[in-house]
Amino acid sequence: MIYNNLKIFSQNICKNMLIVSTIFETHFHFNILFIQEPPWSIICLITSLSCSKGEILVGAPNYPNWLFFARLPTIQLDFLRVMAYINICLSSFCFSLCRDIINHRDILFISFFNNNICSFIMNIYSDASHSALKYFKDTEVNIINLLIMTGDFNIRDWLWDPSFPYHLFISNNLFIIADSFNLDLSLLTNSVPTRYSDTVGESDLVIDLIFLHSGLSKLNNHLIHLE
């Protein structure tokens, strides 16, 4: 079963190119990498017939043996906020970006085939305004067989963060969305923060969450890599 072979690593890297390189150097045992707030910068100058100095090539780094998935910006300031790398060892499952179903810069919706069954995985970055969640609330999206929805949701709640004493209304919206996709919140194997503050006096956070397909025990746990 492919479910036993899906090893997904997810992290908000705050547009830091060095972190991306470090992930590839140290987390090679994963075969799917979900990135939130990725680097999107000048890579090089390419030959141009219209500009003697060359045209600027903007994008994210590519790596050998990895397939790159991202919704490319449609306008200059429409920077992408999620991307994914999938190892070529999974190429036979025909992973594909489904922009015809979900087309939003904060949501990466990817399909794959296993035993002629189409399944999906989803990478999300929800900003402080919860743009991704508002998109789902305002857009009718019929999705079946979504295996995992994960990423940086930017929501604190006592339901998943014991150090936070409140329950927020936006959390209810998140659970309604997850329930519509037949997903359950995955419980941490190790109860630790997912985001450590660099500022003295600020609390560490649990805002990176994983929702898994209901009843699929093979995907029923995850843990935080402290390094």
Predicted regions and their residues:
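A shared catalytic/ligand-binding motif for oxyanion handling
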Residues: 1-227
